[in-house]
Design a protein with these regions (language model features):
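Intrinsically disordered, low-complexity segments
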Residues: 1-577
């Protein structure tokens, strides 16, 4: 009897070896950018077998500053690989031809004239008077390097074809979907941000998927640039709830009884002027009636005096005596029941701190960092950080009252190089390089917790070090706002780990930099301290810039993207048979 079947002739297929050749895909990119936005500075198609080595040199300058502002500005570059199958569910059938070899799916696209008209609508604004303004070419379409409609402010027409350009060339939707998927998986704060729709099942012409109106275009797949969130600190890492899940109840069970009353029912009345309370005599005294009024709530009248109206918000009915229980019983929980409740509470707390993404859940509970490819998400490849330094520009021309000699303005400048990343693609997809510029946060409107301790248990005690999450008061971030709430003290902002205030020091500003010299810092003023997307989103911090318009780009950056590629294709495309 044969020991094993060794004939592999019919169990394997010989595949041809594809030679690899080196190519230099390096290119420069020069553009203008905003603070806090996510820009795709690299978007390169990758093939199975490709080996890319990528890094980016950069030189960044700020637009003119009204002062040599203090604060840390940093430019971040992150590299990702996004497989096509994650952004188009029919990709595998399309690229293989399906089981029949005749699959008819068409890759998702938008005709260029529709895409450009949409970009025009996104960057347009009607102030209600019929006067339209048009933002610069800084949307997502332009950020990908695609051309947009040339436009002159004097001849705006809503959804019109401008300057006779009306090409219907199909523009692939896959890079746009990949950009949104990266934001969903890496930049979105799942505690406050909803996941953006990718609609990976849609293919072919997507024109009918989007209504031709500015708001719908802006919210759609091809809309505006997405925003970065502030780096995590005591406030920006706060949780909206102390745990991710329902409250865990102590496992104490029993049969419910009844409460019996055998005593006079009395009325507790509060005086609005003095704040004092008075308990009436028995409500059921002779000649005393209790009734409900249409507007005043509870009313009391007697044969002695007129009706006495009592506001509902300032009264309580109470029994003076005679309250007893009957028929009830309570059964104590077992030690195992208590253990289960404590373990479940701990489970919910870890889930809240770790995050709701699958990769975060595995890391939080099992301390295992799964690879991005295994979890079907964009793969993070690496990146780098560049500091942007701000220096002074001295006024050395003639002296006048508005700009005396020696007056200081500012200029920002930075040079950097990202870390080098190497990646071998095993399937079709896109290499992304995502750039963002964000300042380090500074705070000056709140009162730290150590200034408001009122009892000894407000201080640190080792016995309490492992209790659950503790509250962050709104007054720690903003003590009050004339626009929203004049007194934020005692109002919940979010939750942080126990005694986190002892382990963190926030950046602060003082003196005139809080007011008249506010243009000397990149600090932002917070008027509505609620834990939501608006608070965590990096805004356009315009304080130090000479031009305060939020629609004006504040940075000019030169990128030298160095990409060395080893690709499965001939170096020369010489015709042959």
């Amino acid at each position: 009897m044969a020991k094993g079947y060794r004939n592999t002739l019919f169990t394997s297929v010989k595949t041809p070896r594809v030679p690899l050749n080196r190519f230099d895909l390096s290119f420069d990119r020069i553009g203008t950018f905003k603070m806090g936005k996510l820009y795709p500075i690299i978007c390169k198609e990758m093939l199975p077998g490709d080996r890319f080595r990528v890094r980016t040199d950069s030189l960044v300058r700020t637009m003119p500053l009204s002062s040599p502002a203090f604060g840390r500005l940093r430019m971040y570059i992150h590299y990702f690989f996004v497989p096509n199958r994650l952004v188009w569910s029919n990709w595998e059938d399309f690229i293989t031809g399906g089981e029949s070899g005749e699959d008819t799916h068409v890759p998702p696209y938008l005709p260029w004239n529709k895409l450009s008209s949409m970009d025009m609508l996104v960057r347009s604004n009607n102030d209600g008077s019929g006067n339209w303004t048009y933002k610069p070419e800084d949307g997502l379409v332009s950020a990908f390097g695609l051309p947009v409609q040339p436009y002159s402010g004097g001849n705006f027409a809503d959804a019109a074809v401008l300057n006779g350009i009306n090409t219907t060339a199909p523009v692939s939707a896959l890079p746009f979907r990949g950009y949104r998927l990266i934001w969903n998986e890496y930049y979105r704060d799942q505690n406050v941000d909803d996941e953006l729709e990718i609609n990976a099942s849609a293919d072919g012409d997507l024109s009918s998927n989007y209504a031709e109106s500015g708001s719908n275009w802006k919210a759609g797949l091809f809309g505006d640039l997405l925003s970065r969130r502030w780096l995590k600190d005591y406030f920006t890492s706060a949780l909206p709830t102390p745990q991710r899940g329902p409250d865990v109840q102590l496992p104490i069970v029993g049969e419910g009884g009844t409460i019996q009353a055998d005593g006079p029912l009395k009325l507790l009345i509060q005086n609005e002027g003095t704040g004092s309370t008075t308990t009436t005599s028995s409500v059921f005294a002779p000649d005393l009636n209790v009734g409900l009024g249409n507007t005043t709530g509870i009313g009391i009248s007697s044969s002695v005096n007129d009706q006495f109206p009592v506001e509902k918000d300032h009264t309580d009915l109470m029994y003076a005596s005679g309250l007893t229980t009957a028929g009830g019983s309570v059964v104590a929980a077992t030690i195992n029941d208590l253990r289960r409740a404590i373990a479940l509470q701990r489970f919910y707390e870890i889930s809240a701190r770790a995050g709701s993404r699958y990769i975060e859940t595995i890391m939080g509970h099992f301390h295992v960092r799964s690879s991005d490819a295994r979890l079907q998400r964009p793969e993070y490849l690496g990146g780098g950080v560049t500091d942007i330094n701000v220096g002074e520009v001295l006024q050395t021309s003639a002296t006048d009252e508005t700009s005396p000699q020696g007056n200081m303005a500012g200029r920002g400048f930075g040079i950097g190089r990202s870390n080098q990343c190497t990646y071998r693609a095993e399937e079709h997809g896109y290499l992304f390089g995502i750039m963002s510029i964000i300042p380090e946060p500074y705070y000056f409107q709140g009162i730290d917790k150590d200034w408001t301790r009122q009892s000894r248990v407000d201080y640190y005690w080792p016995s309490f070090a492992h209790l659950g999450e503790q509250e962050i008061d709104k007054s720690e971030l903003c003590v009050g706002s004339s626009d929203i709430d004049a007194d934020m003290y005692g109002k919940l902002f979010g939750y942080a780990p126990r005694y986190a205030e002892y382990k963190f020091s926030k950046n602060i500003i003082t003196g005139l930099l809080r007011g008249s010299l506010g243009n000397w810092t990149f600090a932002r003023r917070i008027s509505d301290p609620n834990l939501n997307a608006a608070l965590l989103e990096v805004p356009q911090v315009n304080n130090p810039f000479a031009v305060q318009d939020e629609d004006t780009d504040k940075f000019i950056v030169w990128f030298s993207n160095e990409i060395r590629a080893l690709r499965p294709m001939p170096f020369f495309g010489t015709p042959s048979i």
